[in-house]
Amino acid sequence: MELSRIRNFCIVAHIDHGKSTLADRLIQKAKIIDDRQFQNQILDNMDIERERGITIKSQAVTIPYVAADGVEYELNFVDTPGHVDFTYEVSRAIASCEGALLLIDASQGVESQTLSNMYLALEHDLEILPVINKIDLPAADIPSCKHQIEHDLGLDPDDAILVSAKQGQGIDELFEAIVKRIPAPKPSDDNSTKALIFDCHYDPYRGVVVHVRVFSGSLKVGQTIRFMSNNAEYKIEDVGIFKIKLEPKDELSAGSVGYFIAGIKTVSDIRVGDTVTSAENPAETPLAGFKEVKPVVFSSIYPMDSNDYDELRDSMEKLKLNDASLTFEKDSSVALGHGFRCGFLGLLHLEVIQERLERDFDQSVIFTAPSVRYSITLTSGEEIFVDSPAEYPDQGRIASAREPYIKASIITPATYLGSIISLCTEKRGTQTNMQYLDEKRVEVTYEMPLSEVLFDFYDRLKSYSRGYASFDYDVIGYRDTELVKIDILLNGKSVDALSQLAFKGNAYDRARHVCEMLKEEISRQQFKIAIQGAIGSQIIARETVNPVRKDVLAKCYGGDITRKRKLLEKQKEGKKRMKMVGDVELPQSAFLAVLKTKEAD
């Protein structure tokens, strides 16, 4: 296919603005799949995505299109996630495209992720095509949407295409706008082969399937290719394009988006953002890859059975292949054995990884309480970064501590502004800006600690605003804080896997919450169990699980009181001895309960 007839674009938008539904309509219109095989959210091929109704992985697909003037085009497009935790997926999709469809819900208008995704596209010089979706809804307000496109986004509202992805309205006009307004890939002056790896997945029979965008040269079956980051060489066994399923081709030429398989079994050889070149005529310089993503939430993960450690490691490596933003390193715990310390982009990312490990890889795992990465200055003047309670130094060695702060942008209907301001203030937020976008919508900007957003902020924000508020954030640096380590003790023994780092002002509530949760989860034993929350040697919270006891007086009908007292004393001695040797068994549900946040007020 000539370069001038190829169009590469992605669909970006806020959560629930209809990206996957629009992708469904484009695919149906192109007739690349039989109606019998078609299902909604066709590109969302994970069970989690379908159940939650969200997109987690960007998915590429190639569709043919014959324009009104009779010219045939090849359209490569990527359906992207909308949630703030998966912005990295969006940025990778954007790097392999020349244009972006910016989708706006006609009933909701411009929201926080709409803005941040547009700025991402502008950073990469993409042609932005605004699309107003859901025009069939009774609540659709098209004039207001056009006003927001002009004033909030700075785009020409007359360029906006009106569609209803659900009903299929306006899809023909959208196709024509794509071929007319999104530019074709630029021809390269360099004759050497250069292809950017923007994703991968693991096939148990064929090894690693590498997703690429070819910028110059071509990739063919039988060609020997080289990865420029580590000089590993492989021979291509198969190349092709994505038409929902993999469709083999003879070659991938410049401008194309597709895949290649080269019998790669060493998962660590592949790095998303790397450049693939030809081993015979290698390129001198690699393509600009992706910005290294920095995890913001950390949690340790352990197998339920310590014998499954090697299986868990293999699963983590295969998962990292398909999710480049996941980071992990070896970790160990006295209570839980060997495991991994993992970095995530947010709490939803953590939940998704946990579900994928359990469903896709059949792993039973325990996650510890999530934490952020703190900066600690020791009395010796040395600065260290700590994201795990196990690494936390003695309080006497700490001169000062700092925690990461975020700039949070919240767009909400004016009706709910009061309760949202109260929530942000409770979460130690400082308001930096507030502006009315129109008579009904307000944007408020807060600077607040990232650790406060981890627990129940997002749920409560949605609850207070009846689901209408939208939230986006950027990490802006570190600020001073008062940090303490909360230890959880069971009958005087510290359980390292339940320890947490917390702001001093929240420590009492956090410790009490964990103790209450554990009391509900730990089954009664034959001896009393004391559950305590402590900072250093000071106990700040306590709950008690009462013992089960046998009625030793059941056989005594009347008789001397000293006989009864003797039996009770004997039972008491036995309980004391049992407590000395008895270990408290913690069920997996106890670890999961600690992760649960307090219900929104």
Which role fits each region the language model picked out?
Residues 1-601:
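Structural and coupling elements of P-loop NTPases
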